[in-house]
């Protein structure tokens, strides 16, 4: 599975740095600790706010994810949900 960076519709400003792209990686089991998998798969906002800082490069903060443009949160959440689907189901995250 090719893991391309996600280009944000609305850049995140962090001090003098502007974040325009975010790389996601498939979460390991320990990174899902404390989260309900059904919530993650349903792209529950609270679950994504907790999970995304654990699996993004650059590492986003919970506050940055919470203030993120909703279209960008949907893009990232869709990719996370795709990571969690078994390969035999025929769905690969873009």
Model-derived features with residue positions:
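Short, surface-exposed, charged amphipathic helix/loop patches that serve as local interaction elements
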Residues: 2-94
């Amino acid at each position: 599975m090719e893991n391309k960076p996600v280009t944000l519709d609305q850049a995140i400003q962090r001090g003098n740095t502007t974040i325009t792209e975010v790389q996601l990686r498939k979460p390991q089991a320990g990174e899902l600790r404390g989260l309900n998998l059904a919530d993650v798969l349903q792209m529950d906002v609270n679950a994504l706010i907790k999970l995304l800082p654990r699996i993004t490069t650059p590492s986003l903060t919970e506050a940055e994810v919470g203030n993120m443009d909703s279209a960008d949160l949907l893009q990232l959440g869709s990719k996370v949900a795709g990571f969690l689907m078994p390969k035999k189901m025929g769905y690969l995250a873009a």
